[in-house]
């Protein structure tokens, strides 16, 4: 059966296995004990007429992912296939192997400027030497991440506009590093220093830092402890504060030591306290 493939521009063309063979071969380069032909063979079973190029990419990813249980190195192959899809989304064009590094660095500068304009990133990020930072990106470090790592970053951490991600992994690490360096005297040097630390996975900041560093709501702390007063005003003021912290991924700890115990007298209402448990 002649399967038609729907391109991003809506045009239909006949499916040829050569393109997905090439994608699988690139994804498996330098990875031991994985077979690009097996990935392609299983992916072909999922094809159908008028399938989109994105759905073909997903079929390849799923095919590689299903093999991780038998051979863990398929996690790196699946990661590379997912990265290929991610790059297309970030670059907003096809990935050209000859100009890939240029596309990558260009996307970093463009995304910082675009996200500042959209009020998603702190305008002080424009004070950094963006061309210098783009040249400091070690693009090959994308290969350090396994499939689950890339998928988690894609689903939860990369900034999105109009439901499209705006950051490739090294751009993401650099954005986080810039946010951490924003008040440094040598902000460019410190950003590169932080970037080299976290992009090599020698240290990974906590989730709130990854979410919010460099953004217009730079809440970087993981956990907060708040003491609630034993009064209507204290309880609802505390709840409001906790909601604000939780909104930007802060972890919450409640000190309820001041709460009166079950059966204690409430002077204001001439009632009896139900204690802590019903309130919780």
What are these regions (language model features)?
Residues 1-280:
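Extended catalytic cores of very large enzyme megasubunits
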């Amino acid at each position: 059966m002649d399967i038609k493939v729907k391109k991003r521009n809506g045009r239909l063309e006949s499916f040829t296995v050569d393109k997905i063979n090439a994608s699988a071969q690139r994804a498996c380069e330098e990875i031991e004990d994985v077979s690009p032909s097996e990935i392609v063979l299983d992916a072909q079973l999922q094809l159908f007429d008028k399938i989109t190029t994105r759905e073909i990419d997903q079929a390849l990813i799923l095919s590689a992912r299903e093999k991780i249980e038998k051979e863990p190195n398929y996690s790196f192959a699946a990661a590379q296939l997912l990265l290929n899809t991610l790059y297309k989304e970030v670059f907003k064009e096809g990935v050209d192997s000859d100009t890939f590094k240029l596309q990558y660095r260009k996307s970093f500068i463009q995304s910082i400027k675009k996200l500042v304009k959209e009020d998603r990133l702190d305008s002080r990020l424009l004070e950094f030497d963006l061309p210098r930072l783009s040249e400091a990106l070690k693009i090959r470090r994308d290969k350090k991440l396994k499939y689950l790592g890339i998928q988690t970053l894609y689903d939860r951490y990369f900034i999105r506009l109009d439901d499209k991600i705006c950051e490739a992994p090294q751009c993401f690490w650099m954005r986080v590093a810039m946010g951490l360096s924003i008040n440094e005297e040598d902000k460019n040097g410190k950003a590169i220093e932080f970037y080299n630390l976290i992009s090599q996975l020698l240290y990974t900041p906590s989730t709130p830092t990854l979410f919010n560093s460099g953004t217009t709501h730079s809440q970087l702390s993981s956990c907060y402890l708040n003491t609630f007063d034993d009064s209507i005003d204290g309880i609802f003021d505390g709840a409001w504060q906790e909601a604000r912290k939780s909104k930007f991924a802060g972890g919450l700890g409640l000190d309820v030591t001041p709460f009166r115990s079950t059966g204690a007298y409430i002077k204001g209402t001439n009632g009896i306290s139900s204690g802590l448990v019903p309130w919780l």
